[in-house]
A protein has these predicted regions:
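Active-site flanking residues adjacent to catalytic metal/cofactor-binding acidic residues
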Residues: 50
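Rhodanese-like catalytic fold shared by cysteine-dependent sulfurtransferases
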Residues: 13-47, 55-95, 104-139
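Short, surface-exposed ligand- or partner-binding patches at beta-edge/loop junctions that are enriched
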Residues: 99
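Short, Lys/Arg-enriched N-terminal segments with co-localized hydrophobic residues
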Residues: 1-15
Length: 139
């Protein structure tokens, strides 16, 4: 039994992913756009912007003007039409541009949304770069 137990633990360890591996997969799947491109898309009014940071972070820096605030930990519910938490502003065919603190959470969120059937999801990176580039912000 000890041998079987040790083998099971080793097999399990082989399948575990690190946060770096998750992020690498997300960055490979979700298109990263420059902040200038994001600002142009914002001006066009054709994209949905989502800030995936928590409310405390958003309160301290502000967010992209007109963006939805859907925390990373809630996106699976807000993006799923079958839940009572579905955000009706979301559309699987519309361009969705995600922002977070530095780009990592936006990438992970984008991967999740793509896996849920959203077809045009992009990552504009961190809010600091957006503010520095003088993109429209609201508090």
């Amino acid at each position: 039994n000890k041998i079987i137990c040790k083998l099971s633990v080793r097999e399990k360890d082989k399948k575990m992913k690190t946060s770096s591996e998750y992020l690498k997969e997300a960055n490979a799947l979700v298109e990263k756009i420059d902040v200038e491109v994001g600002i142009d898309r914002h001006k066009s009014g054709k994209a949905i912007f989502i800030d995936v940071r928590d409310s405390a972070d958003i309160a301290s820096t502000g967010t992209i003007k007109g963006s939805l605030q859907i925390p990373r930990g809630f996106i699976e519910f807000a993006a799923d039409e079958s839940t009572p938490f579905y955000n009706k502003a979301l559309s699987k065919d519309q361009e969705i541009i995600l922002v977070c603190g530095a780009g990592g959470l936006a990438a992970l969120t984008g991967k999740t949304m793509i896996e849920m059937g959203y077809k045009n999801v992009k990552n504009v990176g961190g809010i600091g770069d957006w503010i520095k580039a003088e993109g429209p912000v609201e508090k």
